[in-house]
């Protein structure tokens, strides 16, 4: 939306609303939203069993490339052999059996690519970013949102990362990861990232009553599934068992994609509106991001913007980078006991929370204000 004053902007998406089911629940067609033309296309049905079969069948090439990365030699091999075609057909089937695969959307880009000045696919983990990047690589500004995980080492990505016009990363850690995978033959690249919006809070009295929220709480915002939570619920319950006098509850905001743990100290809100989310963040005592896989972490930056002290998973390079660059506006924990220790320090020290909150606000304003981000993005668009 921030580009509409300078460009005609279209957003191409699918009709999928729930990524787990992968069903076309939103009508196909065009819609104007805040000056942006949103075009929605039907996605193919997902085939979970078939997808898992192809993932297993192509595992060896990902594992081989990951081992070369761990030995710190993949980048040097990539300088000589930038494009890998091993297991290409099987990895194509991995993509085509996955969620959000839409031949109709891809065909639209192929047909209309000459009408676009720039194409900006986001998230290389999903089929659309991969296929749209190859439709018009000379016009493509790829925003890969990469993580250190198995899928990052797919051989088919080598063609994309060496042929697109520009690659915009969210953090230095993400950029370094890509450089060590794709080497010096990788396309021109740099940081773009994303800015943080200021959203008005919903009325706190109404929100608190609606979701039965306590006075003091640790807050998680995101998908409620095992892959994102990484034992954090169990860690918190161990904390409460050790510190019986603690008044903290654990509020989890987001859709339920795995069975919730039932406990009197745990409160699940389900999906909330943006205004409600900001009200819940503003009144949290402490926030936590337990994910091991992040390319940026918007929720961490939103919390910092509102002066919230953060606890993050130390096993995620991107989150560790935020801790360092913000001068410890966020604290990394490494295991259950470390989490318990640092949460206790934050719960019992208002001064520490205030100091971290001040640092977080400065960090977001310095690195993630929209003026900084839009200058980078427009420069990338004009370069293609």
Feature locations, PLM:
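N-terminal subdomain of nucleotide-sugar transferases
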Residues: 1-42, 114, 236-244
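Nucleotide-activated donor-binding/catalytic signature segment of Leloir-type glycosyltransferases, i.e.
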Residues: 38, 254-278, 283-286, 326-327
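Donor nucleotide-sugar binding/catalytic pocket of nucleotide-sugar-dependent glycosyltransferases
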Residues: 139-150, 157-203, 213, 220, ...
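Conserved donor-binding/catalytic core segment of Leloir-type glycosyltransferases
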Residues: 210-228, 233-237
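Aromatic "clamp/platform" in nucleotide-sugar-dependent glycosyltransferases that forms part
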Residues: 292
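Short hydrophobic beta-strand element within catalytic cores of glycosyltransferases
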Residues: 309-313, 318
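A short, well-ordered alpha-helix in the C-terminal region of glycosyltransferases
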Residues: 345, 352-366, 376-379
């Amino acid at each position: 939306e921030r580009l509409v004053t300078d460009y005609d902007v279209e957003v191409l998406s699918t009709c999928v609303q729930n990524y787990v089911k992968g069903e076309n629940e939103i009508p196909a067609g065009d819609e104007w939203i805040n000056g942006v033309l949103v075009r929605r296309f039907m996605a193919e049905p997902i085939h979970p069993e078939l997808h898992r079969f192809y993932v297993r069948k192509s595992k060896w090439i990902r594992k081989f490339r990951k081992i070369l990365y761990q030995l710190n030699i993949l980048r040097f091999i990539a300088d000589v052999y930038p494009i890998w075609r091993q297991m290409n057909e099987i990895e194509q089937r991995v993509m085509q059996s996955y969620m959000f695969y839409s031949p109709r959307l891809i065909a639209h880009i192929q047909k209309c690519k000459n009408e676009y000045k720039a194409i900006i696919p986001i998230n290389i983990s999903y089929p659309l970013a991969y296929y749209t990047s190859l439709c018009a690589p000379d016009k493509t500004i790829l925003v890969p949102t990469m993580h250190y995980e198995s899928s990052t080492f797919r051989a088919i990505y080598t063609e994309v990362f060496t042929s697109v016009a520009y690659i915009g990363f969210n953090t230095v850690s993400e950029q370094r990861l890509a450089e060590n995978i794709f080497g010096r033959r990788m396309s021109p690249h740099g940081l773009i990232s994303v800015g943080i919006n200021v959203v008005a809070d919903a009325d706190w009295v109404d929100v608190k009553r609606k979701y039965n929220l306590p006075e003091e709480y640790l807050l998680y915002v995101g998908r409620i599934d095992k892959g994102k939570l990484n034992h954090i619920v169990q860690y918190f319950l161990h904390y409460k068992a050790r510190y019986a006098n603690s008044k903290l509850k654990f509020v989890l905001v987001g859709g339920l994609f795995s069975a919730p743990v039932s406990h009197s100290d745990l409160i699940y809100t389900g999906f909330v509106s943006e205004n409600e989310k900001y009200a819940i963040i503003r009144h949290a005592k402490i926030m936590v991001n337990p994910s091991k896989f992040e390319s940026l972490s918007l929720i961490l930056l939103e919390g910092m913007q509102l002066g919230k002290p953060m606890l993050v998973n130390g096993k995620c390079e991107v989150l560790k980078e935020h801790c360092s660059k913000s001068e410890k506006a966020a604290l990394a924990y490494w295991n259950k006991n470390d989490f318990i220790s640092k949460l206790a320090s934050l719960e019992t020290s208002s001064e520490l929370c205030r100091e971290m909150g001040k640092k977080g606000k400065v960090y977001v304003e310095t690195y993630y204000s929209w003026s900084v981000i839009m200058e980078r993005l427009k420069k990338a668009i004009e370069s293609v």
